[in-house]
Amino acid sequence: LKSVTAMVKAIDMIEGVDVVVSFRSTQDNNSGRGRSGSYPIMLIAYDSRKDSLVKVKTLWKYLRVNGTTPEGLCYEAVMDEMVEGMKDRESYFLNFSDGMPMFGNDDVDYHSTEALDHTRKMVKELRSRGIKVMSYYIGDSYNSDRYMGDFKRMYGKDSEFVDVTSVTAISRTM
């Protein structure tokens, strides 16, 4: 979250550049047993076209990154909200991910091959719309070949394995 905050502050100083920050997770409205009250959610935490940095400074301290990450489902849900790239305008999708897209409730079981392939399909759709994708792997399993392999499978050439707590390391890849 610190790296994202630093990037938002830096980008805010560049004239003519808009930034939208979203978080994807799950919401559990279920007070009992079972998974029927669990839903994927996408929170637009900051939109430079509408919000000021005061929002970042006052509200982001209450954000917690947790829950499962239904990546492809969330990308698909907001695809039409993303600004497409054009010859006179560049558009970037910057993603931090643990490389494990998954979600489940009583109606949906989204994980493993299905989730990986769906996320890869959504990333290809972003690219086809002229949106440049930059995806960074985060998580406790940094040295896990399996998770890094899954991450590469979803994001391909656009995947990076850097220390996401280092804004300098991230900026070198941009």
Residue locations for each model-derived region?
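Acidic, glycine-rich A-domain
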Residues: 1-174
